[in-house]
Amino acid sequence: MGFSFLLATVQKERMKRRSRTRSRSRRRAKQDPKTWVARYIPQDLLIEILTRLPPKSVMRFKCVSKFWSSLLSSRYFCNRFLIVPSQPQPSLYMCLLDRYNYSKSLILSSAPSTSPYSFVFDQDLTIRKMGGFFLRILRGFIFFTRNLKARIYNPTTRQLVILPTIKESDIIAGPPYNILYFICHDPVNDRYKLLCTVSYASDNDLQNLKSELWIFVLEAGGSWKRVANEFPHHVPSHLDLNMNGVLYFLAWTDPHTCMLVSFDVRSEEFNTMQVPRNAGDTLPRQEKGVVNRVW
């Protein structure tokens, strides 16, 4: 009697298990494969998907979770997003400034165009008024100065970073001076740096010329440090070129002598080469005081 009852109980339990198994199989068979959602998406696949989305959509996904916010803000993802070949043509920005009234400026951004030989610009009302005299663009960042402070603006995230001023300069604490900033990138270590030149001359002939070179590494807790104290005194030009981790710009040591300065962003080493000229030529020089015309 006891054995028969035990056997019946075991058989009943087996039937329940088989019934549950068949029910799960039926539900899977009825499920539409088009609406099936995977429980887990590998991170590398997730990154590949996100890098092919428009920038505005990527910024919205930062609100999904802390993990997504950290992922989309990571340096790896930002670099990956820049090199994906399927991304649309990047926007071009233009700033128009009234030379007689620096408080009047107009920011334009490129609009979609059907012709590869022309550009169409519209007024961009999404970017805040930035000001400044010179705008520099590097890897999607807009760099400018206002009130003698260096500022970096990300047009994709609408984030603005204001860097501290140089407080230990011997020139800034004295008479009127010229100050000019350059933004550059180290592709080996993937680091951004600012090079600042502070210069002073008593007249247009660059008499009593003095200059200083300062570097700021864009990282948490970064600060200005003075470098190359033995570098020749000079007045830099606002024309510069970033190429393969090296910053190039022109500088004047006197009204008739111009040199090409190269700055290795990674090693922070400077090199110079005199610009060739014919006898008697006077090289053009930037207008005195133009670099500190900021507001």
Curated annotation (Swiss-Prot):
Listed name of the protein: F-box only protein 8
PROSITE patterns, A to Z: FBOX (PS50181)
InterPro entries linked: F-box-assoc_dom_typ3, F-box-assoc_interact_dom, F-box-like_dom_sf, F-box_dom
Sequence ranges assigned to domain F-box in this UniProt record: 35-80
